[in-house]
Design a protein with these regions (language model features):
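Short loop/turn motifs at secondary-structure junctions and domain boundaries
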Residues: 36-42
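Short hydrophobic/aromatic beta-strand element in the GNAT-like acyltransferase core
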Residues: 43-47, 57, 73, 107, ...
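Conserved beta-strand in the GNAT
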Residues: 47, 53-62, 68-75
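Residue-level recognition of the GNAT/N-acetyltransferase active site
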Residues: 77, 81, 111
């Protein structure tokens, strides 16, 4: 397993990953936002490879005031769920944040399908928005304590 910074050559693989998680985990309306995000130059985003393939991606960003870091677009290809890739990529991102932005709050938003995963790493639910991502996909705002 290896993790490296995202490069535009990874674009199609990342699109395949988000599509594999739609509609259960990702509302189709989010695809255009994700594509726009991947095209930006001001992001910190990583890709994770198993022995052969790109199987996960995720990053983070600093909010405009610099008061908090927000995890962004953490995705594991649906064929590779529950194999530890999401955990490894999350730990990598959290360590990267700790080294670059010590003592900065870490926030994220996720759905009812994955919030318990983040609770295992110390995140706490701050707010739940019913259908926050789309019909049947509730938005859970979380913070790392």
């Amino acid at each position: 397993m290896r993790i490296e910074p995202y490069d535009s050559k990874h674009f199609e693989n990342c699109i395949e990953i988000i599509q594999s998680n739609t509609p259960k985990y990702i509302d189709p309306s989010e695809h255009s936002d994700y594509k726009d995000y991947l095209l930006r130059n001001d992001k910190t985003y990583f890709v994770l490879f198993n022995d052969f393939n790109l199987v996960a991606c995720g990053g983070y960003g600093l909010n405009k005031s610099g008061a908090k870091v927000v995890l962004s677009w953490g995705l594991v290809h649906s064929q590779h769920h529950n194999k530890g890739y999401g955990s490894e990529l999350l730990k990598y991102r959290l360590n990267h944040i700790k080294n670059n932005y010590p003592d900065t709050e870490i926030h994220l938003d996720t759905s009812q399908h994955t919030y318990r995963f983040f609770e295992r790493f110390g995140f706490n639910v701050k707010q739940i928005s019913k259908n926050g991502y789309g019909e049947g996909l509730d938005k859970y705002d979380m913070i790392l304590k």
